[in-house]
Amino acid sequence: MDSINIKELNDRIQQESSFVDLLTMEMNKVIVGQKHLVENLLIGLLANGHILLEGVPGLAKTLAINTLASAVDAKFSRIQFTPDLLPADVIGTLIYSQKSEQFQIRKGPIFANFVLADEINRSPAKVQSALLEAMQERQVTIGDETFKLPEPFLVMATQNPIEQEGTYPLPEAQVDRFMLKVVVDYPKKEEERLIVRMNNSGEFPKASPILKPEDIIRARQVVRDVYMDEKIERYIVDIVYATRTPEDYGLGKLKNLISYGASPRASISLSMASKAYAFIKRRGYVIPEDVRAVCNEVLRHRIGLTYEAEAENVTTEQIIAEIINAVEVP
């Protein structure tokens, strides 16, 4: 790709990504701190991928996606997952009307642009798979009719850390459908003081709608057009391959710590998330730093740890760090 095209593309990205700062400012009006969370929400939104959030209750996970939906002027719904939830409670069902003596379709809360699946690991596998199928297919079948889900469609699922009681861990195949897994941490001291002050004063700012859903659909197309060199493609595939055969990259010590590596879906997600990150940084091309910036979020839920790794308290983040240090940067 010649430099003229890259310059044109860069100018176009500069123009098209001007809303990113406005959207971030709008969200920061409502959410104190959690910059990492806000950034990853934008990456998921622009890369057309769903997000899994892990963190203890009370860290503004619900508030974050609700605020994003308000700023994009889109429909938001929240599904609280509980042990007695049924698939019909998520996707919808047929209701018999005595008046018309016919079955009528009642759509479930999945029919929204932004869906918060709260505490997804509190529900049995049957309900989890109904949601994850809708995420993958972007359509839902009720009775014998199939309905397309609205665009843009973004699911943000939250889960409590597995140590907490009464949880059903998500199977690996289903976790793989989430583009990003973001670990949400506690706010800093100063931020928490500001949160307390805002609550004491009773002043709760609201996000104003600054975008339309169509703007997001257009921005996604621009993100796809962000230029990725073949060297960067090879770099991404090398990182993912190193999770499967670490010994080929001089990381023999990791072989006994990894039970399974990341799937090809990880390579696709890493590529799209890197493009979205470059777009957020107002660049028309991907550089290795973009790939490294999103590596943890894309790979942390796609690498299986052996019992040996768990016994030694090795985390997937440590394994990813070793891989990034070992794989040659283009």
Feature annotation, model-predicted:
Residues R12-S17, V30, T167, K181-K253, ...:
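Conserved C-terminal "switch" segment of AAA+ ATPases
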Residues M1-Q14, P246-P330:
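C-terminal engagement/docking regions of AAA+ P-loop ATPases
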Residues N40-I43, Y96-L116:
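Conserved alpha-helical scaffold flanking the Walker A/P-loop in AAA+ ATPase domains
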Residues L45-T82:
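Walker A/P-loop
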Residues A88, P109-Q136, P150, E165-Q174, ...:
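Conserved AAA+/SF3 P-loop NTPase catalytic/coupling segment centered on the Walker-B
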Residues Q104-N113, I142-Q159, L170-M179:
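AAA+/SF3 P-loop NTPase mechanochemical coupling elements
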Residues V56, V90, T158:
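P-loop (Walker A) phosphate-binding loop of NTP-binding proteins
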Residues I13-L59:
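Pre-Walker A (pre-P-loop) alpha-helix and adjacent loop at the N terminus of AAA/AAA+ ATPase modules
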